[in-house]
Amino acid sequence: ECEVDAICDGENFLIPGIMEQVERTGVHSGDSICVYPAQHLTQDEIDTMVDYTGRFARELHVNGLVNVQYAVSNGKVYVIEVNPRSSRTVPYISKVTGVPMVDLAVRCCLGEKLADMGYGTGLHPNAPYVAVKVPVFSFEKLHGVDTQFGPEMKSTGEVLGIAPSFHEAMMKGLVAAGYQFKTPGPGSCVIISVKGQRQGRGPPSLPGSCTTTATRSTARPAPPSS
């Protein structure tokens, strides 16, 4: 799933950047790890999102902010929803791209044109770093809350990791969100849970001193269909 926040003056539009959600489609964007710039899109998929966003903004006569959520599968881009308003990702994408979206949107509402604001139109160039937004949850304090991810948002905050590479930015974000990482050693226990269609490929390489456990379906995968 990908998300785009854009500004439109009624004619031209500006997309500061395309964001990619790590969690599966259907998980509320506020509960999903969000990556800028998107790491797994082809140029054709990017061009399609830019084209669709511009067409939506013009057709809806947007004069200000618009948010579009996309799902990408097997090279095809699907539209989940279009919201002619600001979204919760506007502060994030504004900060990591340096494009003051709210300021530019207000100026558009007052009659100015994007072409005269100095940020260009279309898709803004990517920043020379990766920014990962990680949600923060309060399950330890809110007892009895359903921890299953879905369309209802359950996170209570978020943190940001910025680094030259995706993996470093991800690690910074996870550490800032309170996740602890330890090197497996004697006495360690590693829990493995593998998605259905990936079962049967074998567990990852782990130190022999670790105790390995798994969820029921991973430990006893269903036999392959004939």
Predicted regions mapped to residue ranges:
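Surface-exposed amphipathic alpha-helices with a cationic face
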Residues: 203-213
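ATP-dependent carboxylate activation and anion-phosphoryl transfer catalytic cores
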Residues: 1-200, 225
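Short internal beta-strands
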Residues: 215-222
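Residues within well-ordered alpha-helices
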Residues: 206, 223-226
